Amino acid sequence: MAKKKTKIDSEVKYEQELPLNPKKKRSGAYSKNKGNAYELKIVKELKELTGNDNISTSRANSKKLDDMKIDISDPDNAIPCYIQTKKTQSTPSVKKINAEVGLKDKPLCIIWNIQEKKEGNTNITSNGEYAIIPKDFFYELLKSHNDKR
């Protein structure tokens, strides 16, 4: 810790201790931009995977879907689930997110990019990406996979 000097009547006094490396506070805009960029990355991957160019972010395509907490718009039904993306350090609250989603006719898949602080808490990097899906939906995917074999 460094100390801030002040002069009072030719006498040096130490007022307070200041941290050498103050933590940088990230703004809400930073988090929003990070999340938007992650949505676009997932859209690009899904377009390549399905060959469907109509997949887009719900922000760009449907305010109604966006308000229902669904991040990826799929008007052609090329994806068997709704998608919510998260790029956070903390584990997403799956129960809360499922309760907030406005549509229930397809299962919800939460695609989570785990963020991790590194090197003095100033840099944040990805520590893996995971898809969180309901168990019943996982069993449907497994059955479909085995039926094709």
PLM segments and residue spans:
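Glycine- and charge-rich intrinsically disordered segments
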Residues: M1-K23
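Domain-level recognition of nuclease-like catalytic cores that cleave nucleotide substrates
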Residues: A2-K4, N113-R149
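Hydrophobic transmembrane signal anchors and adjacent membrane-proximal interface regions, especially
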Residues: K4-I8, S27, A37, P92, ...
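Compositionally biased, intrinsically disordered low-complexity segments
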Residues: E15, E45, I114-K117
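Catalytic centers of nucleases
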Residues: E17, K24-L103
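Conserved beta-strand segments of the P-loop GTPase G domain that flank and frequently precede/overlap
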Residues: Q84-T85, I110-N113
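Short glycine-/polar-rich loops that comprise or flank the Walker A/P-loop
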Residues: D105-L108
